Amino acid sequence: MGLKITVHKIAMGDVEDPELYAAAPIMEFEKSAKGRWLTENSKQQMEYIVRPNPETYGWMVIIFAWLEEQDLTYYRLKWGE
């Protein structure tokens, strides 16, 4: 199944429909080299959650992926996270 890790965060302002406004940045992330690699190597489909961001009174989108230990090591070495 792999380990669930946070792979990307997107901060947004106070918008009326955060799911709608998050769509474009999520698609940009999925098209990046990091996003493509994670899509190919995640053991389950990546998922995201939208939460209130109390620091900015806006929203935070958090994207998760499931990686095996070997893939997680590669990910951390390649992207330094």
Language-model features, listed with the residues they occupy:
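Positively charged, low-complexity terminal tracts
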Residues: 1-60
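Short, compact, well-ordered microdomains
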Residues: 52-81
